[in-house]
């Protein structure tokens, strides 16, 4: 159709963990030209006797593994607009600002590489 795609990196990570696929391979399978925005968020881990289930809840900081996957996404798709989603259990403003600064730093790294 030619329309752009919003890539939810946290959802890719959560789904990969829950369903047993490689999130990096998933990113590599997406054509470079289609991703126009990236979303990041935190997730909740629900533990059970027989394992765990990650839930894309948007109520926690971005996990380190998601930051790593985000860096891979920015390398692949370029420094495109990024939104950090945090819907419930909002922290202090300083925490939100820190998350935004971390995303900005990764975008700036990519800008510097392109220059």
Regions found by a protein language model. Give the residues of each.
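Gly/Pro-rich active-site loop or hairpin
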Residues: 20-77
């Amino acid at each position: 159709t030619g329309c752009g795609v919003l890539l939810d990196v946290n959802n890719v990570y959560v789904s990969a963990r829950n369903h047993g696929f490689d999130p990096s391979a998933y990113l590599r399978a997406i054509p470079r030209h289609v991703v126009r925005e990236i979303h990041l968020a935190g997730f909740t881990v629900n533990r059970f006797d027989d394992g765990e289930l990650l839930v894309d809840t948007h109520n926690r900081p971005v996990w380190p593994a998601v930051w790593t996957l985000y860096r891979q996404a920015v390398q692949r798709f370029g420094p495109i607009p990024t939104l950090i989603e945090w819907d419930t259990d909002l922290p202090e403003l300083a925490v939100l600002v820190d998350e935004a600064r971390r995303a900005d730093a990764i975008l700036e790294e990519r800008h510097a590489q392109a220059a």
